[in-house]
Amino acid sequence: YVDKMLTGRKDAFLYPAEYDNVSGYSEPQESKHDFFVIGHTSTSVSLASGLAKGRDLIGGNENIIAVIGDGSLSGGEAFEGLDYMAELGTNMIIIVNDNQMSIAENHGGLYKNLKELRDSNGQCECNFFKAMGLDYIYVNDGNDVQALIEAFSKVKDIQHPIVVHINTLKGKGYAHAEQDKETYHWRTPFNPETGEAKVSYEE
């Protein structure tokens, strides 16, 4: 949604009369900045790998950046994208926002390894991303803007695929959101002091 706000569609989020003028997800008919019609999960890495291939074919030098959350990382499409990027071997920056949160809950061996990486500050011997042939760096405090700037400055214009694994706290700085990640993942209007919803579905 922030992407839509930054690409000329903010009115749909500000004015009720404009609400139906944008879709919930990426839609090329809405904006030149939307390249695909997609859903909301596990798609970014594979789509970015296609953009990277297209860039390489025309001799471009843009940074291709995919952002994916840990909850979406176990999707098959994400695995395919990571696998292909390792083979392509050219510039792509894969940002993994690891906030240990998924509405459906995270299960599987991948999440055990993500925990090992967090617990070891990214240094544990077993590293899923490196095993796939990808470069890797870890940011322990992903809510620290300066730490993010430093990490992104290091990987900008890199000539091979790299994973930037960022450990974040969902809702950082707002106690109600920190304590109730699922409710604040998608929220109706609420009182910022009490955290209580201003509307009820039972009304």
Regions found by a protein language model. Give the residues of each.
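Cofactor-binding active-site loop characterized by glycine-rich and histidine/acidic residues
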Residues: 1-88, 203
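Short, glycine-/Ser/Thr-/acidic-enriched flexible segments
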Residues: 1-2, 30-32, 71-73, 99-101, ...
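Short acidic, glycine/serine/threonine-rich loops at helix termini
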Residues: 2-8, 73-82, 104-109, 115, ...
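Conserved thiamine diphosphate
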Residues: 25-28, 53-63, 108-151, 199
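Structural beta-sheet core signal
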Residues: 50, 66-67, 94-96, 166
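Residue-level preference for the first positions of well-ordered beta-strands
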Residues: 63-65, 91-93, 161-163
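Mobile "lid/hinge" segments at catalytic clefts and subdomain interfaces of large enzymes
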Residues: 74, 81, 86-120, 126-128
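Terminal amphipathic helices with adjacent charged low-complexity linkers/tails
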Residues: 96, 103, 143-198
